[in-house]
Every structure is written in C-alpha cells, then in structure tokens.
C-alpha cells in the first residue's frame, strides 16, 4: 500500500510544483503591485505544501519527484491568467479529494485535508483576482527584448531554478540533519535570487522563462555536497564574469551580490563535506 500512497503523493507533488511556477510567472509578469504580491504569497503556500508532501514521501520510504506537472501559462490578459489559475486550483482540489478517499493512513489523510483547505481558499482568491484584474486594468509588463543583458538574466534564472530543486531534493534525501537544514536554507536563498532576476528581466523589457537544467540525484550525502560545491564554483565564476560585462551599475551590483551569496554557499557546503568525510 505504501507504494500506491507514494505514487499518489508524487502526483500531488507534481501539481504543487506546476502551481508554484505558474503563479510566479504570472506575478513576475505583472510587476510590482498589490495583486502580484498576493499571488506570490499563494505561491509560497504552495511551496509549503511541496515541502510537506516531499517529507511525507520520504517518510514512507519513497523519493520525491522533481517532475513538474502541466501548467496553464497562456491567455491574452491578466484576467485570463487568473481564470487559468482557478482551473489549476480546481484540478488540484479534485485530485486531493480523490486521494483523500483512496488513502486510509490517518496521518497522510489528515495532511491532504489540510492542504485541500488551502487550495479551496486559493481558488476563491483567484476568482476574486479575475474581477480585480479587470477593474484595475492590470497588464502584462513583459517585453520581447533579447540581447546580452537578457541572455545573462535568462541564464541566471535557469541556474537558480535548477539549484533550488537540487538542494531541496538533497535536503529530503540526506540523513545528515545539519546538511538538511543548510541545504534548505540555501534553497530559500536561491529562490530569492530567482525572484530578483525574474523581476529585473521584466523591468528590462524581457520575459522570464523558468526552466531548469540537469539536476544531481545523488543518494550519498558526500556525493550530494560535491555536486553542490561544483555547481556553485562554476556559477560564482560566471556571475563574476557577467558582472564585468555589464555596464548598468544597478544590474552589476545585483550580479555581484548574488555571486557573493554563491561563494558563501561554497564555504558552507565545503565545511559540511569535510565533516561528512571525517
């Protein structure tokens, strides 16, 4: 029965993953404002669901999937996006209700009921946002700019998304509690970077594309940390190079700030690896 529950929870995990990215794409495209902030807050609640589900899967002896479910990112207006977000929530609600009926494990059932309550609230929020977007005349602020600046920002977004998933997966699988905590902390920091870069790209006239590259799926903590150190070293050097190629002072400061964070991550992971190898 555990295998069936794990499969259902991984299906739920895919849905949460899709919702997070869909909502962030919409929020970033709207720029700064009250409704964009509210949508980001909903995305953060979906991140909490993602974490709960992943931990439950590991507790049952499974491996959390990093596959992303189907997203609804089309639509020619902000209100159309909000309708798609309602549909995303309705799909999630139906799936959670189905799994709650199918699962007998009391603790898992209780967890899904807790998440379901949030999803119903989110659906109501997005229904409200349909009207709010129409009344406020909310617009898609993304542009079609494509040059060296947008190329650098697109690369940064791709990297940050990749390591968010990699560090979270490693945090779920490692038995090392200190490493787990640090990996989750750095994943949160990388999520901040993703937001900064996406917002900068929209402000610069571009359009964020949130996709990831290959993710290390090591099962031994030392191997995880070696992979994490390797990618951080490569990326810190690339942020440094990119900052040197940028004339815009504000963007240069942003890239150097992120570079400094990546250097910090290298030091943290290196200390953890040294302890793990003792």
Feature roles, as predicted:
Residues 1-278:
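Iron-associated oxidoreductase/ferritin-like identity signal
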